[in-house]
Amino acid sequence: PENAYRNGTMYSSYTAASFARKYDLAKAYDINLAGAVTWGFEFEDQQWYAGFRDMATNGVDKPVLNVFRMFGMMEFNRLKVEGDFDYDYKKISDASVRDNPDVNALASRGENAVTVMVFNYHDRNAIEVKPTPVTLNLEAIPSNKVLVSQYRVDEQFSNSYTAYKAMGSPKNPTLEQIDQLEQAGQLELFTSPQYMQVKDGKLTLNLDLPRQGVALFKVEFMP
């Protein structure tokens, strides 16, 4: 379809990157941002993955919806994120993302956990490029032991569109295929959660994030 990018990871990574910058804009202009919504619709009795601006197709969740599930897991006392970044909100608003990819993060803390969303977005939907190595250094963790879970939205994880294309893009999926698509459309763990030791309140997490990928780390404080 003409707007096939809305079916896959370009739309989901763009959503992560753009929503993160809304908070930067609000801070820059001293605005109390109480919430944000996405411009999405519901289209009934349409072809599968027709490229509409929606969160699901014929009841099957698309990757973009899993990014909103990630946002829903973030308890919002926002944490400061520092790093060697190629873009800020002003550069993106002036020139968009044309050169290096926009690799950045949004972090928050709740009573018993820290969550960090990492995204790797580019205006050119070239998903075949090499993943970007990312190192997260967390500080001031109030526990000596944590449980770390990583969720992922990319070409292989939490992506019903990839599953649909692997089926041959059927115009009328069977009930069995629909069941497979529904399962593929759920938010997936990248690996099994693991316990990690914290030293002097610090923890380092490493990942290789594919182009147009989004990762969410949930770091739960253990007693």
Language-model regions: role of each:
Residues 1-113, 117-129:
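Aromatic/acidic polysaccharide-binding cleft in carbohydrate-active enzymes
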